[in-house]
Amino acid sequence: MASLSGTNSFVKVCGVTSMLDAQLVIDAQATALGLIFAASRRQVSLEGGREIAQYAKGAILVVGVFRNNEPDFILEVVEQVPLDAVQIHGELDGNVLNVLRRRGLGVIKALSIDDDDFFDFDETAVDAVLVDGPTPGSGAAHSWDALTKRSFAVPVIVAGGLNATNVAGVIEMTGAWGVDVATGVESAPGVKDRELVVNFVSAAERHYSLGKERGD
């Protein structure tokens, strides 16, 4: 994927709602931050998302997150907000995909571990898949057993109930290329905690570095 191809691992802090928290995530040296444009406790407006993205652009990868949004709205956001990649929960519209490709944006398709199409989805049309639990953004942990029964042809990002304490173990268990966190680094919904963010990013990157040393 054009905007993410230079990364050997991927640590994303999702649900950023302010420039203050964007800077916090940048300072922690995460790979990416996520701006949620779907209905959520961490939702940002088009204008707010644009302001944060413009502030963070170049310092960190900026991912726009959508869940069952209308295709026209996704295209409007892509037109007005300087994103590096788009993460889609729900149906991936063909026209939207074509526009994202023309713009050179990375495309991440989110799959719930209990979705009917988890085993049937053709991931070759996207750049990465994000595997989450049945209720994204809830902070609830879930079983990763399904990932031992399903291989993907593209990089895999895991999410759901992650925090600084368990992230290394989840990476080890799943072999995931990337990790994604929201609730596990917050003091309140949409409010990031500096210490939790730093500890999470450090724990994830430390394990990825260890894997490289081992030749994983």
Predicted segments with their positions:
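Conserved N-terminal beta1-alpha1 strand-loop-helix module at the mouth
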Residues: 1-216
